[in-house]
A protein has these predicted regions:
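Conserved glycine-rich cofactor-binding loop
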Residues: 9-11
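Conserved glycine-rich Rossmann-like NAD(P)H-binding loop of the short-chain dehydrogenase/reductase
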Residues: 23-39
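Conserved NAD(P)H cofactor-binding loop of Rossmann-fold oxidoreductase domains
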Residues: 84-89
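Substrate-binding pocket helix/loop in short-chain dehydrogenase/reductase
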Residues: 92-94, 100-105
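Active-site helix of classical SDR
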Residues: 116, 152
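Residue(s) in the substrate-gating loop at a strand-loop-helix junction
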Residues: 136
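SDR active-site lid
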Residues: 166-229
């Protein structure tokens, strides 16, 4: 049985691939970068499983159907779907181009939902399957310069929760992984804050997140928040902080 991991050429996606391979799953790893083939070669050296790699732009609406058709044509039976592909941005809404807005809406909402539709049908018919969706703590925080990013993650979070309830009695489990900050270089966080965040556990390494996420998924959990206590504290504090002060904190690059 195969696990599909999207956005698997680096960061959390690559670590998800390593964790799934260590659990004995064959892999289909997907990225919009050609380097995915090199990453597949590295994984083959480390794990005795079948590892396929595929270059696809998942930011277009036909991507989900194309990926499903590829699996059907090549007799790839998928038991695990990890929707990890995404983009991060730190800009005001009108600073983004029309093309970028279409990309982020497709990548964070349309493509994951349609991949779940196509592969979920097979999983439900088979009576077994797992889906992991990478959400974000920003789904619960409305702040400037993360307007589109946070809103798309809010859709994915709520969609994941709903479908988990719909499918869990049919042997298919959908897990919402909600991270805070991850040490992948995507975030515009000042170096001293990154160092402090890692020391305190507020910022986590991608391999740690991947292990926690997969463990929760295979247990059939609806959600795992990483790091849990810090996310809870942050959401509590954000609810208390005036909007003006929150804007200053964002401008300082604290989150």
């Amino acid at each position: 049985m195969y696990a599909i991991i999207t956005g698997a050429s680096s960061g959390c996606g690559y670590e998800y691939a390593r964790v799934m391979a260590s659990n004995g799953y064959d892999l289909l790893i997907v990225s919009n970068e050609d380097i995915i083939h090199d990453k597949a070669a590295l994984l083959r050296q480390e794990y005795p499983v079948t590892i396929l790699s595929l270059v696809r732009n998942l930011g277009v609406q036909e991507a989900a159907k194309e990926l499903y058709d590829y699996c059907h044509t090549n007799a790839i039976e998928v038991e695990v779907l990890i929707n990890n592909a995404g983009v991060y941005h730190d800009r005001d809404f009108l600073e983004d181009t029309e093309a970028f807005n279409q990309l982020i809406l497709n990548l964070h909402m349309y493509t994951p939902a349609m991949l779940m539709y196509y592969f979920g049908n097979d999983m439900v018919k088979r009576g077994k399957g797992y889906v992991l969706n990478m959400c974000s703590i920003t789904a619960d925080i409305a702040v400037q310069r993360l307007s589109t990013y946070g809103a798309t993650k809010a859709f994915l979070q709520n969609f994941t929760r709903s479908v988990h309830v719909e499918w869990k009695n049919q042997g298919v489990y959908v897990t919402n992984v909600t991270p805070g900050a991850i040490n992948t270089g995507l975030y515009n966080i000042r170096p001293w804050l990154t160092k402090m965040g890692l020391a305190l556990g507020y910022i986590v390494e991608p391999d740690y997140l991947a292990r926690r996420g997969v463990k929760a998924m295979l247990k059939g959990r609806a959600k795992v928040s990483i790091p849990g206590i810090w996310n809870t504290i942050l959401l509590f504090l954000v609810a208390l902080v005036p909007t003006g002060l929150l804007r200053l904190i964002r401008n300082w690059g604290i989150f």
